[in-house]
Structure formats: C-alpha cells, structure tokens
Amino acid sequence: MVHLIPFYKDANFKIKEAPEIIDFVKKKRYDYHKYLECLTETFYRYNPEGKLLLSTDMTTNPVNYQGECYRQDTSDKTIIQSKVYNETRLICDDNGIDENIIMCGTDHLINRKLDKIFLNQDFDIKIPIRKTARVNNAMIVVKKVTDNVKRFFEYRYERFISDEDSDPHWDWYGDQRTYDKILREELNLLPVREPPQKFPYQLGSYEVRGCKIKLIEYGGNECGSFDIWPNHRRGFEDNTYFYDFKGKRKEYFFSSYEKERRNYERQRKKEDIRVSP
C-alpha cells in the first residue's frame, strides 16, 4: 500500500516566516486547503487502496479534509522548520508506517497509480534533482524504513538545525538545501560558493550514509513539473505519476485539475461503453 503524506499547516505569523510564505499566503492568497482537497481526490482516483495522511500541527484543520492526520506540536516553529521536524519524526518514530512512503506538500496532483514508483526497484530513498543540478524535494520517496534510513533522516534534521545560520534563505530553502549539502559532501561534489551553484550531479543510485539513494529527475516521469510553456497549452503526460506546481505554476493548478478530471471522466465513459453488453 502506498502512503502519500503531504505536509501542511496554517501560517499564524506569530513567528517570523519566510518572505515567500507571506507572498503566497497574504498577497497571492494561494488556497492550500483547496490544493489539499484536489490532491486527495486525485490520489484516491488512481490509488483507491492507498492511504493519504496529512502531516500537520496540533491546530490546523483544513476545510473539507476528512482524512487522518499525523500531528506534532510545532507551535514554536516556522512552516519549513515544522515540515522538516514532522518528516523526521514520521520516519524515525514507530508510527506503524514503515514502507512505500511519499512525503510531499499539497500543491501537487496525482496522475496515475503510484505503486510502480516502488515496484522492482532497488533503493532506500529517492530524491529529485532539478536540471539546474540542485535538489527539489517536491517529493521524497522512502521504500522501507530501516535503521540506516532513520539515521539518515536524524542526521538530516541535525544538519538542518546546525546549518541554519549559513544561508540567508534557509527559512524557505533549508529543507531541500540540507539534502544538497549532505549529498555534495558524501559524493564529493563541493561548489565554490554558497548557496550551491551548478555542479555535476548524475542521476542514478549512490551509497550515502548507509542508504541507497536514487537521484531521479525533477520534471521526469516520477516527479513531474507542470510545464506552462509554450503558450500554456501543455496538459498532463499519461506516463507521469506526480505533478508539482512550483512557483507561478500554481496559477494553473485548478484549471489543470478540472481539465484532467474531465479527461479522466471521458476516458472512463469510453471504457464503460466498450465493456457494456
């Protein structure tokens, strides 16, 4: 069974948040509750035997969300700090969830059955890499929680805390730049300056701190990035499992959801006609 575990918590701004959080929530007013609703619907559309578990704080209750929650008290933490903390505790504590895990945000849509991301593949953790040769953790995939996997995530949390003052944009990018730092150090891919510039990641499998880490393409079939060019006409590709709506792509989230929902319903009707007596 696939466990999709998106993180989301309401921003209260009693703690200083990243400028991007202020921009998305207060200025652009992106509707993360509605994103979650669409993500949930598309997940169960293709994965009826799977389970979606919202990772959040003790007080967030998204509108129209009736599923289960994994809650941690992160009232003293920013949203990115909370995300990293929840991901760490989810993997490292005994929560009864120990295999076929996809951790993500809410601004995503599912496009097909997700179990093939795990089947007949030898890895512990999958991490997406952008074409600019940096980590984008739109999704982090864990095949099975082992002791080494737990130690990897504990170390990642330690580095997230210890490196917090090394980057002025850590309050927004720190969750994924921590992965970058660990990978660069372990694979001896050290950039000349911080924050990390381009460096030669090669997709494939690597041994990192006792774990088999598989680097996959951000924008590829497993972790797709919705493409708004050319002329905003592109739809979903049938062989792409998961679509991320990064940055300005969020403006196309709901129209894409409606378009793909209609396509799905038309396809179902065609299939029903073919099998009808």
Feature annotation, model-predicted:
Residues 55-61, 110-115, 221:
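Short, polar loop motifs at secondary-structure junctions
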Residues 34-37, 82, 86, 173-181:
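A structural signal for well-ordered alpha-helical segments within the folded catalytic domains
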Residues 73-76, 80-135, 141-145, 149-150:
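GT-A fold catalytic core of metal-dependent nucleotide-sugar glycosyltransferases
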Residues 45, 90, 181-182:
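Residue-level signal for well-ordered alpha-helical scaffold segments within enzymatic catalytic domains
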Residues 4, 53-55, 102-105, 110, ...:
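A structural signal for short, well-ordered beta-strand segments and their strand-loop junctions
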Residues 147-267, 273-276:
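Catalytic core and acceptor-binding pocket of nucleotide-sugar-dependent glycosyltransferases
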Residues 135-136, 239:
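A generic structural signal for well-ordered coil/turn residues at beta-strand boundaries
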Residues 1-80, 93-98:
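N-terminal anchoring/stem segment of glycosyltransferases
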